[in-house]
Amino acid sequence: MKGILGKKVGMSQLFTTEGIAISVSIIEVPENIVTKIITKEKNSYNAIQLAAFDKKQSRFLKPEIGHFAKANTKPKRFIKEFRDFQGYKLGQTVDVSIFSPGEFVDVTGTSKGKGFAGTIKRYNQAIGPRSHGGGGGSKPIRQTGSLGDISGNKVVKGMTMPGRLGHEKVTKQSLEIIKVDKENNLLVLKGSVPGPKKSFLVIKSAIKKPNPKNPVSLFVPNSDKEVKNE
């Protein structure tokens, strides 16, 4: 099991040797620091705490500064706990080289917030009839409709109603690693990842392994060689 913290840079595209364009997400993955070791003897489970992206020390309280000082590192902005991770030491660095092209990962982040939205946009409900008494503006066409049986005297839990859309924890599963750039600390994944640019992401080894398929052969300009993800 592998895991690391990163930040979304944006999206781009790469071309295969057959000329097919592949949409890719570029993720910045700096050196992660192990800032805490959690053992089963003390906390009833095994885990490690990773931290990344420096932040001004003046923004932290003294106990927080002392927590990072134990790992001999500067205060970090993004901190996450990874369960069932063993074999790490306090203060150890983890970088993008733990992954290799062809592997599959799960990426967790916070989706883009879209503000207040109605049920048609939020839950993909159908629009009401525009004739036979359903006209008269957008209200009767786009309204929520029935909220349940009147004898219950309540709105049942889970009823689809208008509210805030987006800004939720989302996980994209089984994304293929197309390229690992160790020099620039970048990870290139096939497809999209949650959240806007500069949003923080948690990257872990994929739980659901996809069916084996042919590796992606990338086209490299000014070169006769193929780059295969094996």
Swiss-Prot record:
Among the record's GO biological process terms, what is one?
translation
Alphabetized UniProt keyword annotations: Ribonucleoprotein, Ribosomal protein, RNA-binding, rRNA-binding
Any one Gene Ontology cellular component term annotated for this protein: cytosolic large ribosomal subunit
GO MF term list:
rRNA binding; structural constituent of ribosome
Query: A Pfam family in this protein?
Result: Ribosomal_L3
Stored InterPro entries: Ribosomal_uL3, Ribosomal_uL3_bac/org-type, Ribosomal_uL3_CS, Transl_B-barrel_sf
Region feature (Disordered)? 125-149, 210-230
Gene3D superfamilies found in the cross-reference section: 3.30.160.810, Translation factors (2.40.30.10)
Q: Which family does it belong to?
A: Belongs to the universal ribosomal protein uL3 family.
- HAMAP family linked to this entry: Ribosomal_uL3_B
> In UniProt terms, what function does this protein have?
One of the primary rRNA binding proteins, it binds directly near the 3'-end of the 23S rRNA, where it nucleates assembly of the 50S subunit.
Assembly description: Part of the 50S ribosomal subunit. Forms a cluster with proteins L14 and L19.
Enumerate the NCBIfam families for this protein: L3_bact
Protein's name according to its UniProt entry = Large ribosomal subunit protein uL3
Organism, scientific name: Mesomycoplasma hyopneumoniae (strain 232)
Q: Which gene encodes it?
A: rplC
